[in-house]
Design a protein with these regions (language model features):
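Domain-level signal for soluble alpha/beta catalytic cores
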Residues: 1-173
């Protein structure tokens, strides 16, 4: 959507999204050529709908958008990246402010063979911006087979250790 609003066509927008994956894959291959015993992975990054709005709402979660609008926003980007399935290793769904948005993206990725991690912003030591506790978020996402990791980002550094404590007992083995 952001590319489209900048005057690019749908095809140009798709090409730019895919270029990010292609450049990351090339960087990985260059690294592995120079470091044959090394390991390198490419994450296909999916950011929040609020980042497109460019109003800071990715940190608040108050998009005032319908679930259908959020689904449509993520669908096009995911489909563009999915065409390059051989060039990335996992999905990194990052900086989400709400469980609702995470569940929409998880549903879109449900049939995808790549594992996915989901990370959230926090409004305080225990809650994501929409108000749900991190423990509740962890329990909800733990039910989804493709979700392999849950984390936090873009938050106060002191809250990172608290997340480990809060999520203890919420994740299945």
């Amino acid at each position: 959507e952001g590319f489209r609003e900048s005057g690019l066509s749908l095809e140009q927008s798709k090409a730019l999204i895919q270029l990010g994956v292609e450049l990351a894959d090339k960087a990985r291959n260059d690294f592995l050529t120079e470091n044959p015993d090394g390991k390198a992975y490419v994450a296909a990054s999916i950011g929040p709908y609020g980042a497109y709005l460019a109003d800071g709402s990715e940190y608040r979660g108050n998009y005032r958008a319908s679930p259908e609008t959020i689904r449509e926003f993520h669908t096009g980007r995911i489909e563009a990246i999915r065409e390059l399935a051989e060039q990335f290793d996992f999905w990194a769904v990052e900086t989400l402010p709400s469980l609702d948005e995470a569940l929409i993206v998880a549903d879109l990725l449900a049939a995808d063979p790549h594992p996915a991690w989901f990370s959230f912003t926090l409004k305080d030591e225990e809650h994501i911006p929409e108000g749900m506790s991190l423990a509740e978020v962890t329990r909800a996402l733990d039910e989804i087979p493709s979700v392999t990791a849950i984390g936090i980002n873009c938050c106060h550094p002191g809250w990172v250790m608290d997340m480990r404590i809060l999520s203890t007992g919420c994740i299945s083995a």
